[in-house]
């Protein structure tokens, strides 16, 4: 199985990135390739600097659209469905590839959300991108342990 996390953010080497690497390593024990990809280009930088919500959302869509492959695509958004960990683990059943998308500061353009199979919310709280990435990676690992009856989730 291949799981990818695409995030509108600048790549950084910090404690959050180390935690992401930790969960990537743990996922491999279940024969799952977890990839974390930070996406940030000139168009996104210019739109965000101008604080233009519509332009920023469009820039996110254009940057991420090409990653909407044959995988099961899930957008993280505050309006998305809330899951408990057991329900979240069901997302991975009978799937070979799952893509998660974490938008930028201005969220996703409606057309991009319609291109995804579902929308997911990690919490009613607003989370910073780095925190959201780590929480998502931990929940992915937790979901894998639930699927494989591993004691981590208990």
Curated annotation (Swiss-Prot):
Annotated SUPFAM superfamilies: alpha/beta knot
GO CC term, one of those recorded: cytoplasm
Keyword rRNA processing part of the UniProt annotation: yes
UniProt binding sites for S-adenosyl-L-methionine: 76, 103, 122-127
EC code: 2.1.1.177
Cell compartments where the protein resides: Cytoplasm
Keyword S-adenosyl-L-methionine (UniProt): yes
Coiled coil feature spans: none
Membrane spanning stretches: none
GO molecular function, one term: rRNA (pseudouridine-N3-)-methyltransferase activity
UniProt keyword list: Cytoplasm, Methyltransferase, rRNA processing, S-adenosyl-L-methionine, Transferase
Reaction catalysis annotation: pseudouridine(1915) in 23S rRNA + S-adenosyl-L-methionine = N(3)-methylpseudouridine(1915) in 23S rRNA + S-adenosyl-L-homocysteine + H(+)
Entry function: Specifically methylates the pseudouridine at position 1915 (m3Psi1915) in 23S rRNA.
Self-association state and partner proteins as the record states: Homodimer.
UniProt record similarity statement: Belongs to the RNA methyltransferase RlmH family.
Protein name: Ribosomal RNA large subunit methyltransferase H
Gene source species: Wolinella succinogenes (strain ATCC 29543 / DSM 1740 / CCUG 13145 / JCM 31913 / LMG 7466 / NCTC 11488 / FDC 602W) (Vibrio succinogenes)
């Amino acid at each position: 199985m291949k799981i990818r996390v695409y995030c509108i953010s600048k790549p950084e080497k910090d404690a959050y990135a180390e935690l992401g690497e930790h969960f990537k390593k743990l996922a491999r024990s279940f024969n799952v390739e977890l990839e974390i990809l930070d996406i940030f280009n000139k168009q996104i930088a210019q739109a965000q600097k101008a604080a233009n919500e519509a332009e920023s959302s469009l820039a996110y869509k254009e940057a991420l659209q090409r990653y909407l492959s044959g995988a099961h695509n899930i957008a993280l958004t505050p309006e998305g469905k809330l899951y408990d960990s057991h329900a979240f683990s069901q997302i991975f059943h009978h799937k070979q590839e799952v893509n998660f998308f974490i938008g930028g500061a201005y969220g996703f353009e409606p057309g991009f959300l319609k291109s995804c199979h579902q929308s997911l919310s990690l919490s009613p709280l607003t989370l910073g991108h780095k925190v959201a990435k780590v929480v998502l990676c931990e929940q992915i690992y937790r979901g894998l342990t639930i699927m494989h009856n591993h004691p981590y989730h208990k």
